[in-house]
């Protein structure tokens, strides 16, 4: 399941980074938040960290953009997740 979520998260973040003004941005952001809640419910805060670490590096390599600001979209899911 995590592999599918990772690919979906990767695609969503790439889309949001490259298209910040599109009409469906809020829908995409909402799905990113939902993925975070699913990961946390399944595997805890470590899963959030591991997933985002992997995604950040992939995005940096592929499009040269920093995904770290998008970590804040998962704030409020876990008390230990504060970005």
Describe each PLM feature range.
Residues 1-13, 25-31:
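Short amphipathic alpha-helical heptad-repeat segments
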Residues 9-12, 32, 39, 55-58:
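Amphipathic alpha-helices that form helix-helix packing interfaces
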Residues 14-26, 43-45:
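Charged, low-complexity interaction regions
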Residues 34-50:
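Amphipathic alpha-helical coiled-coil segments
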Residues 7, 11-15, 41, 50:
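Generic detector of low-complexity/intrinsically disordered segments
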Residues 19-20, 30, 40, 64, ...:
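Short, flexible coil/linker elements and helix-boundary hinge sites characteristic
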Residues 1-4, 26, 42, 49, ...:
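Generic alpha-helical structural signal
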Residues 50-83:
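Amphipathic alpha-helical binding modules
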């Amino acid at each position: 399941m995590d592999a599918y979520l990772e690919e979906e998260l990767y695609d969503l973040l790439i889309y949001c980074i490259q298209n910040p003004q599109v009409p469906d941005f809020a829908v995409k952001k909402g799905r990113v938040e939902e993925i975070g809640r699913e990961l946390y419910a399944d595997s805890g805060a470590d899963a959030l960290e591991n997933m985002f670490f992997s995604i950040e590096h992939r995005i940096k390599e592929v499009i040269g953009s920093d995904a770290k600001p998008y970590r804040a979209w998962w704030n409020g899911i876990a008390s230990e997740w504060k970005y």
